[in-house]
From Swiss-Prot:
InterPro entries: Cyt_c_oxidase_su4, Cyt_c_oxidase_su4_fam, Cyt_c_oxidase_su4_sf. It comes from Mus musculus. This is Cytochrome c oxidase subunit 4 isoform 1, mitochondrial. Component of the cytochrome c oxidase (complex IV, CIV), a multisubunit enzyme composed of 14 subunits. The complex is composed of a catalytic core of 3 subunits MT-CO1, MT-CO2 and MT-CO3, encoded in the mitochondrial DNA, and 11 supernumerary subunits COX4I, COX5A, COX5B, COX6A, COX6B, COX6C, COX7A, COX7B, COX7C, COX8 and NDUFA4, which are encoded in the nuclear genome. The gene is Cox4i1. It is a single-pass membrane protein. It holds the Pfam family COX4. One of its GO terms (cellular component) is cytosol. The modification Phosphoserine is found at residues 56, 58. Residues 1-22 form a transit peptide.
Length: 169
């Protein structure tokens, strides 16, 4: 009775310990999608919020200058204002990546590796080609089947002209 009680307690302790071990992992911060977020996307060109939300003193001064006439702004100031609002331009978003080179390279690597495996298998795993694949053997087997008149109605021998000793046309 004492042994069964001890095993029962040990079992409960083991189960509760494993649950605690599984449950004590790091806390995952949940994203609140109720608030607008910034994203550079071609199909959604005007995000809900600006790229830079915490403005520095120079950026705040530039935003105040933006409220005046835009002809007084220099080209660099206009670019800085654009970069406050957007992270990338359409040209930068549409710029091709070099990821295709990696994909093609990996595909070629695996094709080459597979070819090496096949060459190794042909050299060391597979035996010699059976003699039944030899042209002479196939010719003798064909002649034997014709001599035996194998499947004379719809099959092999039906396509042979025994009078002319040639295949029917």
């Amino acid at each position: 009775m004492l042994a069964s009680r001890a095993l029962s307690l040990i079992g409960k302790r083991a189960i509760s310990t494993s649950v605690c071990l599984r449950a004590h992992g790091s806390v995952v911060k949940s994203e609140d999608y109720a608030f607008p977020t910034y994203a550079d996307r071609r199909d959604y060109p005007l995000p809900d919020v600006a790229h830079v939300t915490m403005l520095s003193a120079s950026q705040k001064a530039l935003k105040e200058k933006e409220k005046a006439d835009w002809s007084s702004l220099s080209r660099d100031e206009k670019v800085q204002l654009y970069r406050i609002q957007f992270n990338e331009s359409f040209a930068e978003m549409n710029r091709g990546t070099n990821e295709w080179k990696t994909v093609v390279g990996m595909a070629m690597f695996f094709i080459g590796f597979t070819a090496l495996v096949l060459i190794w298998e042909k050299s060391y795993v597979y035996g010699p080609i059976p003699h039944t694949f030899d042209r002479d053997w196939v010719a003798m087997q064909t002649k034997r089947m014709l001599d035996m008149k194998a499947n004379p109605i719809q099959g092999f021998s039906a396509k042979w002209d025994y009078d002319k000793n040639e295949w029917k046309k």
